[in-house]
Amino acid sequence: MIKRKKIALIGAGNIGGMIAYLIRLKNLGDVVLLDVNDGIAKGKALDMAESSPVGKYNGEILGTNNYADIEGADAIVVTAGITRKPGMSREDLINTNVNIIKEVADNIGKYAPNAFVVVVTNPLDVMVFAMHKYSKLSSNMVVGMAGILDSARFSYFIAKELNVSVDNVNSLVLGGHGDLMLPLVKYSSVAGISIADLIKIDLITQDKVDAIIERTRKGGEEIVSLLKIGSAYYAPAESALLMIDSYLNDRRLILPCSVYLKGEYGVSNLFVGVPVIIGRNGVEKIIELELTEQEKNIFDNSVKLIKNLVSNV
């Protein structure tokens, strides 16, 4: 009998709960849903378990507040932490969330040192840096989810502007998860046609593209301002799940993720969003793209901000 994969979700809020549901929907493995609020984790787990006879979901789901229950997990997604409220930046969350990540990292190092860890907690590039530092896990096994989400937003806005299927759109966003992210227009396309060529044939204007880039950078803030009492969770959950799926099933997808750089893009000892191949060994390859001078300046400014934010972590 093939042993089922064990996936631990640290944080049973909106994102953690949604990931748990998607794991069961796609039958990726058994789930441990952990939260300091024991009732939330157990309540959501029981609710999902009771849906099994209707949805015909196989696999176990456990709600808990005991880190010992994540022992031997194959993959872990960390969403624990406070979320943004209207008017807050991701950076406003640093002090509180770093302390939360320290505790989570210590327990992952203790109970699941061989797991592939995806960090979702904001500010993302700082939290994944802290996770790597305090968990002592290998850098290829600790990644941050941001670029997939940012790229998805960029793709969606392009598709809506052109009134075409989102299936036709491929895009790529690099850099930090914030206002200095770098949507790469030259590496983005619609049905294989570059955005630059679409501008040339007047299917979209440069002004529209620029507006979409800015909306992408403010994508999370837009949702926070609408929700009032929370932040995005459907798209972040789908994005994190794609990373876990690529790892557990060795799909070797090329995905933009926040990863530890060792000289790539002229950056060392920081986690920054770049395209990578994720397979059964975690981050298997970092893909270095050629950037224009303008793109490099934006990327470097994003890196400077990340470097400043992690200086006291």
From Swiss-Prot:
Signal peptide: none annotated. NAD(+) binds at G11, A12, G13, N14, I15, G16, D35, N97, V120, T121, N122. Substrate binds at R84, R90, N122, R153. InterPro entries: L-lactate/malate_DH, Lactate/malate_DH_C, Lactate/malate_DH_N, Lactate_DH/Glyco_Ohase_4_C, Malate_DH_type3, NAD(P)-bd_dom_sf. GO terms for biological process: lactate metabolic process; tricarboxylic acid cycle. It catalyses: (S)-malate + NAD(+) = oxaloacetate + NADH + H(+). Keywords: NAD, Oxidoreductase, Tricarboxylic acid cycle. GO terms for molecular function: L-lactate dehydrogenase activity; L-malate dehydrogenase (NAD+) activity. Gene3D superfamilies: Lactate dehydrogenase/glycoside hydrolase, family 4, C-terminal (3.90.110.10), NAD(P)-binding Rossmann-like Domain (3.40.50.720). The active site is at H177. Its EC number is 1.1.1.37. Coiled coil: none annotated. It holds the Pfam family Ldh_1_N. HAMAP family: Malate_dehydrog_3 (MF_00487). PANTHER family: L-2-HYDROXYCARBOXYLATE DEHYDROGENASE (NAD(P)(+)), L-LACTATE DEHYDROGENASE. Catalyzes the reversible oxidation of malate to oxaloacetate. Belongs to the LDH/MDH superfamily. MDH type 3 family. This is Malate dehydrogenase. It comes from Ehrlichia canis (strain Jake). The gene is mdh.
